[in-house]
């Protein structure tokens, strides 16, 4: 979506109705987690902590039991942790939520950190995982390589509500893309927190090892409660069940050890066993001449040895505002390609492909060694941060700054007094205007440090974190930026602070700094960093990725909101450490993993030059007024699979040459059309067409589209019917613009007015549309005069079993218990058009609604009780 379009419309509507402004974001699909009760050894007793889940009311109380006896009651504003001086790691703890004085089910322990190490005056709890190291390998040139643990991710792979760890093994001969040489095989393992290995995937000899090659995304993409892994594969990749992808006999390595030939794939692996589910061709291939006609042998990559074409990035984001999509990138030094994919449980489908192939345009040359999908402007859809440029959720260009490539970025509510999220970026190009800069959600530079007048510098490190309690907002600094600055750009000083990672590791609302396994705390009074945890000295732990010295993973894996540090042993590759906070916290904070900004950042943390995760809100403000996140658990409160039978017992033919609106034009230049011409979509990724049609009845039927495509390639389009995705349609080449063909897709029509929106998925735009044919009678183009027999048609489309019902025709709400009720009406574009809220008793209550204020059309009605979505229905007025 373009900047501000949805948010401005919804804001105006809310103000006109005199309502407080609700969140623009829809409820986002998240993992269904347990309480994650953690019992950790802190020397003098145990620290017990647990999650405040995104589905909990902010003032949920808790009872804590040890060996069946209650040892603590946790109040409405207390932190979800308790230091039990009399407890041990073998004690049996349970936690129960208490809502309105009623205790719920007790949940047991998820993880025990039974070990402790004394360091810097505190006892740090930790546990170790024993890993199965891949065997050493010998390369074709006789060189040998060994393995150490490298980057990691986390997700619930088996649906038990607990996180598993996904680990990439790094061979000792891994190479940068600019270097020649053979590399060992890349392996990816999955482990449960008790050390059980679930599977190992062997990416094979045709995938090279190095920081810029294998970017793996692990997330529950299909919403079945079990995560999948998506990663680039090739001939010879062996899945977790031992089955090969492609031809495992093929070896595409050349004499220098590089790989510039052979098919390239993108594969979805099942989380529970590592089985390959769906494999598609990686888009685009490394041969840029298939996409752009180069001026010489180098084409537009800028080299012919695989440096620029073999640089990959990956991220996960909510491109439709509700469900996660996977995003994969090829190239950022020159030509740049971004492909977004959706997974429906069976097939991996391309949502869109963005191409930036010409210098000075789009994403060309603007990429970082990192990628992040995040809702920058609060419109409910995730944008894609690329570096010095960004894309909108639909793959169109959001902005280009022209500042070029960079090595580090940070995104969060860096300045809580500004709208949206802000970005901190450092730049490698010595001719860039700034060496470091803070950027607004729309790409405008808020402030920056200009390059020195004596000559530009290559700024390779940068950090943003909220470390100084004296100043509101984050602090920012970089390797060559001249010191630490506030969110307003004020120079604080030049303290000796690390420029690597951040972590919540103590009990306050401010960041600690992390360099490998070394944690420091910034002293706001002395303006100096103080050692908080010396992991190398205490445990012999270390980071990975050479001089980058990043942790394998930092994430809120269990317990309360504090983060866990996952690092490897420097000397023993079989040993992995999970270290947690040593102290209590009075702060009540929702599990960080139910904040979408943070959760997707954890998913992309392993990408290339690992970047730390930040929250989508300003924590010091949040702890003062805790707000429940807008989330829905995977598999819960979502529309079920549509089993409506397809009806094709009639025929309705419609002229498709004139949509209600669109990016294109109606013409009759080329022969072969049947009625008044055809609609010619613009040749761009942003082209679309919207048609309003009227149906006399509700039915699921087949839509046949008569089209012509005189181009050389497929022109795929996505179809949304009444604001809901109906799928993707392939429009292959017909060979000539006067030759027509048919494409079909099943659509579900409501009785009354329906909106069909076709959106292009390639930069070539769409084909030419001539006719629509529906498989039922009584369908026609809507001209504003047709009406349906009844004034209101209601079709419940979310199978809630809550007992809450709302009748839009009468305004009557029924709730089985008393509570605070909210009723909102949304149009099919997602804009809130009307709303009302009040405290209601159990039983039937009239809600004061003036339906006459709504124009004719279709609406989604959502009902929340005590902050939870309890009922949803469609209404046609």
Give residue ranges: language-model regions.
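Extracytoplasmic
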Residues: 186, 191, 639-789
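Solvent-exposed loop/turn segments flanking beta-strands in beta-repeat/beta-sandwich domains
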Residues: 53-65, 820-821
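Beta-propeller-forming repeat regions
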Residues: 30-34, 52, 77-643, 721
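Surface-exposed, short loops/turns at beta-strand junctions within beta-sandwich domains
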Residues: 85-90, 748-750, 851-856
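Structural beta-strand segments of beta-rich domains
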Residues: 35, 44-48, 689, 701-703, ...
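Surface-exposed, proline-anchored Ser/Thr-rich loop/turn motifs
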Residues: 788-818, 825-833, 855-856, 874-877
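C-terminal tail/sorting-segment detector
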Residues: 795, 835-837, 848, 852-877
């Amino acid at each position: 979506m373009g900047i501000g379009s949805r948010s401005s419309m919804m804001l105006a509507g809310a103000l006109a109705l005199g309502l407080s402004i609700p969140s623009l974001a829809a409820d986002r699909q998240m993992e269904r987690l347990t309480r994650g009760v953690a019992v950790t050894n802190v020397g003098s007793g145990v620290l017990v902590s647990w999650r405040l889940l995104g589905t909990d009311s902010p003032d949920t109380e808790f009872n804590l039991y040890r060996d069946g006896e209650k040892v603590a009651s946790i109040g409405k504003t207390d932190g979800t942790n308790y230091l039990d001086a009399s407890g041990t790691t073998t004690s049996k703890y349970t936690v129960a939520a208490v809502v309105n004085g009623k205790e719920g089910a007790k949940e047991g322990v998820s993880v025990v950190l039974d070990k402790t190490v004394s360091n810097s005056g505190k006892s740090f709890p930790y546990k170790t995982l024993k890993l199965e190291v891949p065997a050493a390998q010998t390369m074709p040139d006789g060189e040998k390589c060994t393995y150490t643990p490298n980057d990691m991710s986390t997700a619930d792979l088996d649906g038990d509500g607990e996180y598993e760890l996904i680990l990439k093994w790094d061979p000792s001969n891994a190479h940068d893309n600019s270097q020649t040489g053979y590399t060992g095989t890349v392996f990816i393992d999955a482990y449960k927190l008790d050390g059980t290995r679930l599977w190992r995937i062997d990416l094979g000899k045709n995938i090279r090892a190095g920081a810029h090659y294998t970017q793996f995304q692990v997330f529950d993409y299909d919403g079945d409660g079990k995560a999948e892994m998506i990663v680039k594969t090739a001939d010879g990749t062996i899945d977790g069940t031992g089955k090969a992808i492609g031809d495992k006999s093929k070896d595409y390595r050349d004499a220098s050890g590089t790989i510039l030939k052979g098919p390239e794939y993108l594969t979805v692996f099942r989380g529970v066993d590592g089985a390959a589910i769906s494999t598609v061709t990686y888009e685009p291939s490394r041969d840029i001449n298939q996409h752009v006609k180069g001026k010489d042998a180098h084409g537009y990559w800028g080299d012919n040895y695989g440096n620029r074409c073999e640089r990959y990035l990956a991220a996960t984001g909510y491109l439709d505002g509700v469900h996660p999509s996977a995003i994969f990138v090829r190239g950022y030094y020159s030509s740049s390609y971004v492909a977004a994919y959706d997974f429906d449980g069976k097939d991996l489908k391309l949502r869109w492909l963005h191409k930036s192939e010409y210098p000075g345009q789009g994403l060309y040359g603007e990429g970082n060694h990192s990628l992040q999908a995040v809702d920058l402007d609060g419109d409910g859809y995730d944008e894609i941060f690329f570096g010095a440029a960004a894309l909108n959720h639909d793959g169109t260009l959001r902005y280009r700054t022209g500042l070029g490539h960079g090595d580090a970025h940070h995104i969060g509510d860096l300045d809580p007094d500004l709208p949206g999220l802000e970005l901190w970026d450092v730049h490698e190009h010595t001719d860039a205007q700034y060496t470091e800069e803070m950027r607004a959600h729309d790409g405008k530079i808020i402030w920056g440090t200009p390059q020195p007048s004596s000559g530009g510098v290559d700024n390779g490190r940068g950090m943003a974190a909220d470390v100084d309690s004296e100043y509101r907002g984050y602090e920012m600094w970089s390797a060559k930026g001249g010191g630490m600055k506030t969110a307003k750009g004020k120079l604080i000083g030049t303290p000796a602070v690390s420029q690597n990672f951040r972590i919540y590791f103590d009990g306050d609302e401010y960041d600690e700094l992390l360099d490998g396994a070394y944690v420091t705390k910034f002293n706001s009074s002395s303006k100096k960093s103080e050692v908080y945890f010396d992991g190398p000295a205490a445990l012999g732990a270390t980071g990975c990725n050479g001089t980058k010295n990043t942790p394998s993973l930092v994430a809120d894996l269990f317990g309360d909101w504090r983060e866990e540090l996952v690092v490897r042993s420097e000397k023993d590759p079989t040993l992995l450490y999970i270290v947690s906070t040593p102290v209590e916290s009075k702060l009540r904070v929702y599990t960080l993993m139910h904040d979408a900004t943070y959760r997707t950042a954890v998913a992309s943390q392993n990408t290339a030059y690992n970047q730390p995760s930040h929250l989508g809100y300003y924590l010091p403000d949040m702890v003062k007024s805790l707000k429940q996140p807008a989330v829905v658990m995977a598999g819960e409160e979502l529309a079920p699979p549509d089993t409506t039978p397809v009806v094709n017992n009639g025929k309705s033919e419609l002229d498709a040459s004139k949509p209600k609106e669109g990016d294109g034009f109606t013409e009759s230049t080329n022969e072969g059309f049947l009625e008044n011409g055809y609609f010619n979509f613009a040749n761009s990724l942003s082209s679309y067409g919207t048609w309003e049609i009227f149906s006399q009845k509700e039915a699921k039927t087949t839509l046949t589209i008569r089209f012509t495509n005189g181009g050389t390639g497929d022109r795929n389009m996505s179809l949304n019917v009444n604001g809901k995705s109906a799928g993707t349609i392939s429009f292959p080449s017909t060979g000539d613009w006067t030759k027509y063909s048919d494409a079909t897709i099943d659509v579900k029509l409501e009785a009354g007015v329906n909106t069909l929106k076709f959106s292009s998925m390639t930069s070539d735009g769409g084909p030419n549309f001539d006719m629509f044919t529906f498989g039922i009678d009584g369908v026609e183009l809507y001209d504003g005069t047709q009406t349906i027999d009844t004034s209101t048609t209601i079709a419940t489309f979310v199978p809630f079993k809550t007992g809450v019902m709302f009748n839009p025709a009468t305004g009557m709400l029924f709730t089985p218990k008393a509570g605070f009720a909210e009723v909102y009406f949304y149009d099919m574009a997602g804009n809130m058009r009307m709303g009302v809220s009040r405290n209601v008793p159990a039983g039937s209550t009239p809600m004061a609604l003036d339906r006459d204020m709504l124009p004719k059309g279709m609406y989604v009605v959502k009902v929340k009780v005590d902050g939870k979505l309890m009922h949803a229905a469609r209404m046609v007025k």
